[in-house]
Amino acid sequence: MPPRTPSTPSTPKPPRVAVLADSDTRWKWGALTAGRVLPGSPVLDGFLLRGRATPTPRQLREVGARADSLREVTAVEFLRVMARESYDVLVLALVGGGVQAVLHGLGRVWEGRGERPVVVTGYVGVVYEKLADGLLLRHGADLVLANSRQDAERFRAVYEGVGADASAVTEVALPFLGGAPYAGEHTPYTVVFAAQPSVPESREGRAYLLERLVRHARLHPEREVLLKLRSKPGEHTTHIEELPYQKLAQKLVAPPNFRLVYGNMGEVLDRTDLMVTVSSTAALESLHRRIPTVVLTDLGVREALGNHHFVGSGCLASWDQLDAGHRPAPDEEWVARQGVAAGGAAGAGAGGGSYATAFDAARERIAELLAAPALPPLNPYYTPTTAPGYLPGILARHHLGPDGGPLPGAPAADKEPGPVRQIVRRAARGAYRHGVQRVAPVIRRMGEL
């Protein structure tokens, strides 16, 4: 592998960073994180891991994160790129199993090389389930980013509890917070419900939330009521959406002040007066901008919904309360612990201006590692010795063997796929998405008869 990006005092070169992501939201997190933790304007090469959630061109445009280059790859193809290309930093914006597989693959392709990229990983939003599993699958990166003080404490406790090195845990904040602070009501007053692909999962739960949103629009004809959707039918996001709200909405007669909207969440928040959700990360974006925010309790406060994360936030409320005009006030101490306390401008709200320094620790740590003459080998907690019944399956999903090398028959990476192969891949992905959103629910209903 060639040396990292060379530079001289007279001709400094911008840092070079690679981001590997497996969905639209993780691409957004990875690309924006790279911009937050590196100085200047880094040269960013994006890689989209081929799979069920590979974002479409429309989703990439909506996310808004830009790259100097962008290509779709398998894990094996990506590892071959890492073996021959030079980067300063690598951001792994993947589900936990993907991170673990790539870490083991990198360990093999970088074997015996002290000069390698600094490897960074983390979470795209609220961590409310599979805490230990997800964290241990991310162990081995040089930095494991925690989006709040609370998460940093929990992450360290998990690593230390299993005897793993916890020094990689680094407190930051969500990289996509920002935008103008809320300055008062708009005309018309706008209520936004941030939908989630898999929360709630049941048809009954999703139909109930949609019906209540439409009812709110009828009760308040002076308000604009928006259903903010993550994806269009046939597209996938980080989580599988079996019952799109678009499909459920076809059966409703909605009032004229109710609409379905897409687009960048930041732009939607620019006109929002009341953000409503079950447990979407959009709630944290809204709280950061001091927009009145509600986390719904209608379906209970449950781990399965993720809204238990907001216990103590002051934001929990029901549709009945909202219909009656309730506007919650967030608990400032809770908000500060989530890393979203800055209210836009310095001095606004609790911890105003703190977001500007939220990434300092990560920048300093990366600078230290880049200045080191050599970096140690990647050392994940999971190995064939510590997890012999778990790790091989994780690696095999990405066509990697127990040693991190490609399995026999793994897709070739020496050349770009031909036109026929690309068409077959797109057709297969479309068939999978059709099966998830149309065939699977029918089969499930038949099984309940």
Model-predicted segments: where are they?
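A donor-sugar binding/catalytic signature common to diverse glycosyltransferases
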Residues: 262-305
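Nucleotide-activated donor-binding/catalytic signature segment of Leloir-type glycosyltransferases, i.e.
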Residues: 241-263
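A nucleotide-sugar donor-handling region in carbohydrate enzymes
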Residues: 140-206
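C-terminal amphipathic helix plus adjacent low-complexity
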Residues: 323-449
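Conserved catalytic-core segment of nucleotide-activated headgroup transferases in glycan assembly
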Residues: 29, 177-245
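Conserved active-site histidine-acidic residue motif and adjacent donor-binding/catalytic loop
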Residues: 72-75, 259-267
